[in-house]
């Protein structure tokens, strides 16, 4: 019996590719973080379904699969190293995480308020203490629109260094 309680978090990042007078093209990547020490847990999903929504009117931007979602295949899985531990940690935890990368290219019409990119999963890791149940998680990313970007068409999301932070 396998459980999907292996996903510990996620990031949505985007990189600007090109633009026309009325559109911008981005490579959007969902990065899922997996606890490799989870017992009886499934592997990284082979694909994910994501939603893309206009912040101007909440309309879904039609994707490549049934229901209008974007079905994105797993591109690569990378082991994540442990970042430097603070001196205050005496009992070093045993940690092993990997990142699953799900990139896709999307061309979006220019709009005023940008776009929201979403991914939902059914389950959370075991023993999480800041929520009352383990019934799922939603991860979102925001691509800004003209009200924020103005004439700066070459906008990329911030990207954090890869690794496991203990504290």
Where do the protein language model's features map onto the residues?
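Long, compositionally biased, intrinsically disordered segments
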Residues: 3-167
């Amino acid at each position: 019996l396998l459980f999907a309680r292996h996903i510990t978090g996620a990031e949505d990042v985007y990189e600007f590719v090109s633009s026309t007078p009325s559109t911008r093209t981005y490579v959007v990547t969902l990065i899922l973080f997996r606890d490799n020490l989870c017992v009886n847990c499934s592997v990284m999903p082979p694909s994910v379904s994501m939603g893309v929504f206009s912040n101007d009117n909440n309309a879904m931007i039609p994707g490549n699969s049934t229901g209008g979602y974007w079905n994105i295949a797993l591109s690569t899985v990378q082991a994540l190293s442990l970042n430097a531990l603070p001196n205050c940690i005496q009992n070093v935890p045993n940690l092993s995480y990997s990142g699953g990368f799900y990139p896709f290219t999307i061309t979006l019409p220019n709009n005023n308020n940008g776009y929201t990119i979403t991914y939902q999963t059914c389950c959370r890791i075991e023993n999480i203490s800041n929520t009352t149940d383990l019934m799922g998680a939603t991860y979102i990313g925001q691509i800004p629109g003209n009200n924020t970007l103005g004439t700066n068409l070459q906008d990329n999301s911030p990207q954090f260094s890869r690794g496991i932070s203990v504290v």
